[in-house]
Structure formats: C-alpha cells, structure tokens
Amino acid sequence: MDLPGPIHDILLVFLGSGLILGGLGVVLFTTPIYSAFSLGLVFVCISLFYIPSNSYFVAAAQLLIYVGAVNVLIVFAVMFMNGSEYYKDFHLWTVGDGITSLVCTSILFSLITTILETSWYGIIWTTRSNQIIEQDLTSNVQQMGIHLSTDFYLPFELTSIILLVALIGAIAMARQ
C-alpha cells in the first residue's frame, strides 16, 4: 500500500498502540474472557501490520486463522472453565512472579537495545535462486508459493510458530 509518509506513520503508531494495549490486557486482566478478547485485539493488530507492506495474503490468512479460529477456540475453552477455581488462594505477587518479571523485563530491555543499536539497512533477509527469477511464472499460485518461500519466509514461519503456541495453549486451557 503506497501511503504518504505521515499517514503511514500514524497507522503504525495506531497499530503499535493497539498491540501494546492488547498485550497488556492479556497479561493484566484477571478475568480469562477479557484476556481472550485482548488476545483477539493483538491478533488483529498483528495481521493489520502486514497491509502497509503489501502482504495482503499474509494479513488475510492471519486474520482468518488467528482471529477466526484460534481466538474463537480460546474463547470457547475459557467459557467452559469454572471461573471460581481461579480465585482460590489468589496471591497478588509471589517470589516466582517476581523472578519471572525480572527475567522478562531484562529480556525486553536487551531486545529494545539490540533493535535500536542495529543498523537494519542493507540486510538481505532471503536469497533467491537465479532459476526462480528467470522463470516466467504464469499462475498466481506459483507466484504466491515463490513469495511465501522467499520474500515472506520469515513472517510465514513466525506465523506458524505463533499458531502452534496458541493451539497448545488453547488445548492446555481446555484440559484443565
């Protein structure tokens, strides 16, 4: 999508704010159903991040898979849970929580430092074979396959890992 600079920046700030607020909602809400809806907001914001980079198929697939399937599965699992079992022996802060938050905070700051200090210009994420470039691809399916295995390889793999983690979490929540 060819947007002017200020509109593109405003869109990224809006989506980033929605992503951060949704992530905080997932962690901070005490009611599991509110956390599940916040996770849906996170999934929507992540999928909308692909639209400004002209990755419409990845955005649509992520909306269909995550919001349409995974988040609905999580909401159903949360609805079948007994809510009273989560409030028994509810301690606001334990030693394990403190250690976990310390580790997560240190990882967050190290990632922020790494991202800010890395020169991202000139990095080639994928390599293309000369045979693929020389071939005349006529089918949209062929073009989509080439793009998924070259240009969008990293987002495609990250999407599959996030989907796997979400399914494992939904199954674990449903079994409890």
UniProtKB/Swiss-Prot annotation:
Quaternary state and interactors: NDH is composed of at least 16 different subunits, 5 of which are encoded in the nucleus.
GO CC, any one term: chloroplast thylakoid membrane
Gene from which the chain derives: ndhG
Protein task: NDH shuttles electrons from NAD(P)H:plastoquinone, via FMN and iron-sulfur (Fe-S) centers, to quinones in the photosynthetic chain and possibly in a chloroplast respiratory chain. The immediate electron acceptor for the enzyme in this species is believed to be plastoquinone. Couples the redox reaction to proton translocation, and thus conserves the redox energy in a proton gradient.
Principal EC category: translocase
PANTHER family per UniProt: NAD(P)H-QUINONE OXIDOREDUCTASE SUBUNIT 6, CHLOROPLASTIC (PTHR48479:SF1)
Name assigned to this protein: NAD(P)H-quinone oxidoreductase subunit 6, chloroplastic
Protein species of origin: Ceratophyllum demersum
UniProt-listed InterPro entries: NAD(P)H-Q_Oxidoreduct_6, NADH_UbQ/plastoQ_OxRdtase_su6, Nuo/plastoQ_OxRdtase_6_NuoJ
